[in-house]
């Protein structure tokens, strides 16, 4: 009767409990049944356990008495609906239960504990259980099959919520990403990306087939729960059927060991560590009897799990918390930049932890560049990574201004690869000229970022929108062009696509990179304004020529990359540009030179940490690696105009139409002069019409009318038939090119020929064809695929030894190291244009010595253009290099460009001046000296060595102590007056990589306010004008003058013009100078590409 009462009081056991009892009987010797009263007294209820922040609940059984063999909590139902949150009854908490930790100290044995737990990893191999020979009968199997039927019917009714994630082929049966040996930072299919299905769920919870909190261990080393999601109910049943069928056939359990009374099973739970990449996270468990489990999981393990709280705050709809990643538990809570879970992006660190990797740290951040990329970099590129990392830790941008051909694109691509590898950024925007985008794609593929890159420059609007949405919703690199940015600024701001709440600063783009960033040198253009409207945490400009015409361009670039560094535009003009321009002029006084040098030094020191520039001569000279790059010799060949060219040139300058054009449109007149110097056939009637058609978009109606009259004036004086029959002889440049090729081609040299206009290339092409030379050509009409194909053909070296290119197209981004001779046919107002052309051949990968020929007609407008190039080059070096520069030339007055040479066209004053300056530095090897002598036989006016420019340091004039002290006091006064006008950020890190002068003091602030001494002269002029005007109004006085007041009227006219010129000069900060270079270079690039 008592037994029946006890049976009535005992609750029915669940299916798993019954199954556990059967397996217990199969694997252990029979025991004496314990007294029923023991189990009756310890009867407990099931408890519902809620994981903090998760919707699913886990039903747990408390420990029962030893009669039933339950010594640990068993998870029975993972998918049951929520019924309420209750506390866990911790009866029997004193029993020992091993953790899944690898520590052997936790693997202890206590008498009376069960042989194993029913909590089983169904992705692990089937267990091999000990058995007794007497338990192999058919009766036992029939009972087991009955249990299986019950389990199948039970599981068929269970509600299993399954996320329908699209899984990659890289996942095995357990939902664990396989080891990836291939090194590639891909997007939705690679180890470097966040899987597309994961991006739709919580960002830090991996919802694969097999996921769960691996273990929870209390402070005394006691174990808690092990939670697992299974694939489907069918797979669940099939796994158990296979496991039970193996009962009696296996003697050991591979992959997991359970605590047992035997000495062979004391290893603790082991979760098949060879496959699974889910990290074990230890958490403490309170020992009080009634514990709120949701509060426990949220608070325990504070030393590790709490540090990842920021990564999981938005995971309110997921089932279980999975802390994955090799270093996830080691992450620090203080993170100035974003850091992501290691497994969140499907990224396997072990496949990338190789030798030669670069690791940089700073401000609790860690940057790692895998060795497979790091080993591809030159030493100077590794230094560039250090500089870029210093900017990153400061939250700043900068200008990478390395000399052309030093691999700036590779430096940036490698740095981005390390940032993505280190989980420090999610998105980067790269803006470049369209001709450079294939080169970017190639370099990004080299560092393994090809699958992460999306193109945003095609003609299909829908395709562009799709790629933009893909990047903004996930991660990766977006490639686009300046024109696309200008027309799609709002879309790139990301307001319509962007939903990431992880960004504390609200910036959609972590990095914005501008290749050929000097294209935004004019801050008033829509191009520059649209780029400034796109939010970005870091802005990097890549430009080998950050200063092309004037210092205002430098301010514009830093205003984009480091806003506020140089103040506003007016402040920069008053405190820097004004004094530097005065000091760099050849006619500057000693005092102006010294003040200009002081201000220039301050400017260099101020921008130094944010501006990195290395020259090829420095990079491959200082580190003993000169063998890696060959030698370059640049020579200027001064040519004499042919008789026909000289006649046209003189007639044009002396004509009345030119004088009228001077007052109306000097740009159009300069265009005609340049074309006369290149080739008279450019100015035939048909060519004049072509020029007008191409210039319609850049010239006003008035300017177009002037240009038409000028061009037709020249065309009417040209005998077209005579020109056609004497194509080579009427142009000194074309005649020289053909004579030079007769010497170069037989010797096996390969030649690049650059011109600014397609029309000039056509004339050169006609001469090459008539002389039987094979050649290749690309210009603005060549399509991008054909352009790349042509470049590859030339680099292979089997098609043609001559390559014709326009400066605007061929001067950007191309690598033509197969050539060792470069001819620049016509100079550009912008010196960087010619320099870009030269560096197509002289760059990393060149193994031959390179000779560059810059063709200039002596005593013409081209010579004055070259002088202007040298002047601008000195200005650039003054602002960026720590050396006192030689002052070769002064600012030119506009009238000098239209004046006839005093010494005739056969002598070049510039060539003579440069020879006097550098004659003692000219040291030519035997081969080059012989070649120069050959050039002199071709009837040239002379040769200048362009490579020697700025090779000397300007002498510093000695001054008296009294004068020096006075200048020092005045400078200190100026510093004090301007120091409060702008706030400067403290400079940290990166300075050693930008410049390395010994006399740099980063803490020094030199801010100079202008002293406008023109106010006095302007007031004097106005006073004289007033006095002369009053005198002229006195009719009695004027009547007594011999000339009737004509001289007074002339003086008034001169003073009025002088005052007008002074005010115009003040607006451009170039006193008494009219400078049209900036306007000319802009319009010529658009209008003269014929």
From Swiss-Prot:
* Summary of the function given for this chain in its UniProt record: DNA helicase that acts as an essential component of the spindle assembly checkpoint. Probable chromatin remodeling factor that regulate homologous recombination (HR) and non-homologous recombination (NHR).
Question: How is this protein named in the record?
Answer: Protein CHROMATIN REMODELING 24
**First-level EC class:** hydrolase
Q: Where is the composition biased (Basic and acidic residues)?
A: 256-273
Q: What is its EC number?
A: 3.6.4.-
One biological process term from GO is: DNA recombination
UniProt keyword annotations, A-Z: ATP-binding, Coiled coil, DNA recombination, DNA-binding, Helicase, Hydrolase, Nucleotide-binding, Nucleus
The record's comment on protein family reads: Belongs to the SNF2/RAD54 helicase family.
Residues annotated for ATP binding in this entry: 402-409
| The keyword Hydrolase belongs to this UniProt entry's keyword annotation | yes
Species name: Arabidopsis thaliana
Map out region (Disordered) in residue numbers.
1-51, 247-273
The short motif Nuclear localization signal is annotated over 44-51
Report the locations given in the UniProt record.
Nucleus
Start and end residues of each Helicase ATP-binding domain = 389-564
What Gene Ontology terms describe what this protein does at the molecular function level? Answer: ATP binding; DNA binding; helicase activity; hydrolase activity
